[in-house]
Structures are given as C-alpha cells and as structure tokens.
Amino acid sequence: MTEQKCFLKCIESGFIVSKPLFDNARYDFILDANGKLYRIQVKTSHWTDDTKAAFVFNGYSQHSVGNGNKRMKYTNQEIDYFMTEQDNIFYLYPANEEGFVEKKLRIIPPKSGQVKNISFAKDYVFEEVIKNL
C-alpha cells in the first residue's frame, strides 16, 4: 500500500516514474526529476508510540534463508532515497554509504531538548526535498 501511495504521489507531482520489470532490483522505482534519475526504495513507517512524536522505518530488506532470515541494509550504492508516508505526508530520506537498520524521524522535539543527532521529519518532506534535486 505504501509503495502505491508513494508511486502515485510522484506521478501527481508531475514526475516520470519507472518500475523495474522484474523483482531483482534493490529499488522500487526510478524517479525522473529535473533531468536526473533517482533510485527510490519505499518503506512503510509506523509511529513509535501513541504521542505521534516520531515515526520509524527500516533501512533493510529481509529474506528467508535456510532456517532463518537475512537482513541486508540498503546503501547509496544501491538506492538514492528512501520514501515513506505518514498521515498522508510524504518523506524522502537520503541513503548513506554504510546503511542503517532503522531510521527515526521526529515530528516533535524530544523532551530533553536535544537537537544534535536528531532527524526532524520537516527536513525530509517530499515537496521540499524534491525542490533541491
């Protein structure tokens, strides 16, 4: 469901969107924005608690192997951005070199007042990020 919503958001925003023919790509679709192509991996996000102060999404794919599961982090060698949606607001978060297991985006600052090493959702809103691509 999240993938369809993100795909549609990109199209409604006037961008060309392309999907791989098969399931062997690490990205979900290609976003053609301002003459450049960006590999987008869509992830479903969820609130961390009932306060809706922050939400999280996974930065990995999971596959069954033998008698267990294998997690593979996404890196900027495979994708350019993660895209997610929370309460009908869409977000683009850049992939990095080492990857991550889980990313938290805060709507409300922590009660401690800490801002260092905190990622605020407002900095990754789709409409704002896309302007700078």
Regions found by a protein language model. Give the residues of each.
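Domain-level recognition of nuclease-like catalytic cores that cleave nucleotide substrates
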Residues: 81-114
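Conserved catalytic cores of phosphodiester-cleaving nucleases, focusing on short active-site segments
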Residues: 10, 29-31, 38-44
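Active-site metal-binding core of divalent-cation-utilizing nuclease and nuclease-like domains
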Residues: 17-25, 34
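Acidic-basic catalytic patches of nuclease active cores, encompassing PD-(D/E)XK
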Residues: 1-19
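Residues that act as N-cap/strand-start positions at coil-to-secondary-structure junctions
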Residues: 11-13, 23-25, 76
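Catalytic cores of nucleic-acid endonucleases
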Residues: 43-90
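Short acidic/polar mixed-charge low-complexity motifs
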Residues: 36-38, 89
